[in-house]
Amino acid sequence: MKRRHLLAAGIGALAAPAVARANAKFPDRTLRLVVPFPAGGATDVVGRMFADKLTQQLGQTVFVDNKSGAAGSIGAMEVKNAKPDGYTLLVATSSTHAINPTAYVNPPYDAVRNFTPISSVCVNPLVLYANPAMPDTMMGLIGLMKKYPGKYSYGSAGIGSIIHLAAEYLKRSVGGMDVVHVPYKGGAPAIQDTIAGNIAWSMETFSTTLPLHRAGKLRILAFCHSGRAAIAPEIPTMIEAGVPGYEAYTFSLILGPAGMPQDVIDVLDKASRQAMADPNTIKFLEGNASIPTPDTTPERTAQFIKDELAKWAPIIRDANVRIA
């Protein structure tokens, strides 16, 4: 009897390291990438592309799970509350990790402390577009707005949207403009009313505005990034157009829940770097008017979030954006 106990104990001792090794092998099953917005949108498109790239690098399926609502907060909360084992990740955006934490009266999460940064995929700069009857340069448009205070209006995708805040940021950057804000339920109605001449201008991404610009239905005056867009190099940056230092964009980051093990972070970091080193990834992102961020690291991603929070917080407060 004693011999059997000793034998069992010996087998257990031998088996324990094997189990530990098996548990340490990450990943050994399917991963979930939460996209906090509906299927078919810009964030979803980037998320699905990156999920495919991670699948190739990790040797395990990474599937996209759309959890939309509350300007991305529902999806962010889904990941915040997930087990920190690396199998549930988030495509974080400007809404979830630059705007909501300040705009919400009672934010449901801390954008820094409740998440583990993995990688940055891209930024998607906005453009400023106007009705074709408006001046054809940024300085001309700004001059007109200042000459006739309160006469003209701009549209946004809603109060607290990146478009609203980017416009408020522009007003600050040019020393103030008295222009009326017209919030819409999404960017598409603002585009239609700009074309119709009901509002003077708005901001959006290239993907929805460039075809209309080239068709002459609206005019893109500036690209809101430090460098010109590869798909439309003829359009000046906002800085070139006369607004020093101005950049406004959405972004796509890969984050996990807080408390992830370092070895799991390292695996995901390596896979993300390899995915971003793929020329097809760069081609895909640039084709969608995004700016790839291939030199990212978890540390740089963490700093990027802090910088974006610091940039937008005073603009949100000055615009008196408070979401209950």
Task: Locate each region found by the language model.
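N-terminal (or domain-start) structured segment
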Residues: A22-V112, K151, G175-A200, D295, ...
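Sec-exported extracytoplasmic/periplasmic mature domains
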Residues: A51, T55, G59, K80-P84, ...
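C-terminal lobe and pocket-closing loops
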Residues: T137, T209-D278, D307-A310
